[in-house]
Amino acid sequence: DVETMLQMLYLYFTNINKDEKSFANLIEQYKVSLKNRSLSPEKALQDSLTATLYGHNPRLKPVEVADLQHVSYDRILEMAKERTANAAAWTFTIIGNFDEATLRPLICQYIASLPSQKNIVKGKRVTFLQKGKIDNTFKRKMETPKATSFKIWFNEDMPYTLENDIRASIAGQVLSMVYLKKIREDAGAAYTCGAQATASIEDDYHLIQMLGYCPMKPEKKELALSIMEGAVKDMTQTVDADMVAKIKAVMLKQADDVAKTNGYWNGVIGVYRKYGIDTHTDYKKLVSAQTPQTISDFMKEFLKSNNYITVTMLPDESK
């Protein structure tokens, strides 16, 4: 019930306790999961992708078994207590079916009474995407030879708007359809492939990012890679009208479905509270207004940044 939820929230801030047994179990779980991590080609690709995107940022270095001995449970608890010692900068959003008259005194009892002070430390960004054109192609021994490529295009200059968010989503879905048709169906170069694009905002940083991926047949890798890159460039000139129409129909239906969930409204309220951007009211109208030309124009502007990263893992078939 709501009161139990708020009681747990209060304890989360004020009564962080040590549980040595649970911590020891967690470390053992990590040891098991990390033990054979280095043998996995998929993990090697994932690590290479992260390292290439963020310039080998030490904060994003993958955890290894040897690192676990340096994990201090006391320091973890200390950090948790530091972050919960001042509730002044926290915002609590409560969404759902509740009676305000019943809820208000509970908020006063369990949230308003949390420890707070005026000294608020603002967070700062510590990870940065590497700009320009970067290609990281490497070979890896694997039991079942296969080639896999990720291609990422991004733009940090275009503003975050609801319309840019919608256009990015449509563009990514169109690209995914094009990949499936040209790479899998027409060329027979892969069993699966796809793409997606997102727009995001965090404080004063905004990012539009498009990602294409393709686990491809090694003997057809050049063809698949060529299609992956060429399809993005082609979208600056022409975008398939039938694909756009199908995507819009799905997005409009999904809009009605997700509007019935608490998670959706939590996101809408969060963006409006932080940035004054209403992502709900005009959403369906803006989706309906998109055309192949608006998506093509979006792609032209998006690709002006010339930020394009490729990470490709090939099978090492040397003896």
Q: Which residue ranges define each predicted feature?
A:
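M16 family metallopeptidases and their MPP-like homologs
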Residues: D1-T14, L26-K35, S40-H70, A88-I95, ...
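Non-catalytic, conformational "gating/processing" segments within enzyme and secreted inhibitor domains
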Residues: Q46-D47, Y73-Y110
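Short, surface-exposed beta-strand/loop micro-motifs that present aromatic residues
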Residues: L77-E82, I134-K141, F298-K300
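Extracellular/periplasmic catalytic domains that process cell-envelope and extracellular macromolecules
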Residues: R83-A87, E143-P145, F302-S305
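Extracytoplasmic/secreted cell-surface and envelope-processing proteins
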Residues: E100-R104, D203-D204, K319
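Glycine-centered hinge/linker elements that transmit conformational signals in sensory
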Residues: L106-V121
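His/Glu-based metal-binding/catalytic segments typifying zinc-dependent metallopeptidases
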Residues: N119-V178, K182
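Feature representing long, continuous alpha-helical segments
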Residues: D165-S169, Q173, M177-K181, S226, ...
